[in-house]
């Protein structure tokens, strides 16, 4: 069969029901047979049938690329599959000829990183963008929950205060709580109080509570009294009228009297009403 006729069949036939008498040989001639998988048919924009079983087209593309099956990759791309999945599949199986061919369709490794679950593949993908530094890798590891990458480079990060502080604050901003705890506990952070600024700004009560646990553990391990610091944060959230944060600070040892005094001063009636009803 001529290549032009095959191309026409690959484009037009998949949107129709394939005749039952089309055996593997005919499908191979039409370019609609996937070795070891079976017949291919497009049924929707994002769905195909593989041997009559539905599968998302991008998942099929990832598998085809992981097998190094150039013909099927090209077919699925012509059906509007996302080329990022071709790069991921090829990276996982180390088909670097396919990686570089289809990476040109994407151009930026950072657009591919959210699709990757494996830390080794994640790092290999990031290396495709030559100008990027290790600091950039660490930053995206935080954003995409790739803690194993930070663990791998602990020796490199140890003592790099500026980078560790940046990663810590990024983890706080992105609500990556496991990262927050690990970075503070393993790498060490000079300015933990930035956590509270971010938590209050983003109204993130979980992060705010986590910050208190970190601060209390730090100060108690050094034999220090946390009361002054707790009341410092309490004043901040009381002035802003943030009742859930006020209550959380009191729970950890902040002064209820300070909260009531500031609520009166700044006329936060909802806070006053809460305490007047005797709930705390």
UniProtKB/Swiss-Prot annotation:
Pfam families cross-referenced by the UniProt entry: DUF249 (PF03158)
Induction cue: Expressed in the early phase of the viral replicative cycle.
Keyword set includes Protein biosynthesis: no
InterPro entries: MGF_505
Keywords: Early protein
Domain of life: Viruses
Its job: Plays a role in virus cell tropism, and may be required for efficient virus replication in macrophages.
Family label: Belongs to the asfivirus MGF 505 family.
Name of the protein in question: Protein MGF 505-3R
Organism whose genome encodes this protein: African swine fever virus (strain Badajoz 1971 Vero-adapted)
């Amino acid at each position: 069969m001529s290549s032009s006729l095959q191309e026409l069949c690959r484009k037009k036939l998949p949107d129709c029901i394939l005749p039952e008498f089309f055996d593997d040989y005919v499908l191979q001639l039409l370019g609609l047979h996937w070795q070891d998988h079976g017949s291919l048919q497009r049924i929707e924009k994002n769905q195909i049938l593989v041997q009559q079983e539905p599968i998302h087209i991008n998942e099929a593309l990832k598998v085809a690329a992981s097998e190094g099956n150039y013909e099927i990759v090209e077919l699925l791309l012509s059906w509007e599959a996302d080329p990022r999945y071709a790069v991921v599949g090829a990276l996982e199986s180390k088909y670097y000829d396919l990686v570089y061919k289809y990476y040109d369709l994407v151009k930026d490794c950072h657009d591919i990183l959210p699709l990757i679950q494996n830390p080794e593949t994640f790092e290999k993908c990031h290396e495709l963008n030559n100008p990027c530094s290790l600091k950039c890798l660490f930053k995206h590891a935080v954003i995409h929950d790739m803690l194993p990458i930070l663990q791998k480079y602990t020796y490199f990060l140890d003592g790099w205060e500026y980078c560790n502080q940046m990663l810590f604050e990024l983890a706080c901003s992105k609500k990556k709580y496991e990262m927050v705890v690990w970075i503070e506990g393993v790498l060490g952070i000079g300015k933990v109080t930035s956590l509270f600024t971010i938590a209050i700004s983003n109204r993130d009560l979980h992060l705010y509570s986590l910050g208190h646990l970190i601060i209390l553990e730090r100060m108690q391990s050094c034999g220090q009294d946390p009361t002054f610091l707790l009341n410092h944060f309490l004043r901040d959230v009381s002035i802003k009228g943030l009742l859930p944060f006020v209550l959380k600070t009191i729970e950890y040892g902040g002064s209820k009297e300070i909260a009531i005094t500031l609520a009166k001063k700044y006329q936060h009636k909802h806070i006053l009403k809460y305490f007047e009803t005797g709930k705390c």
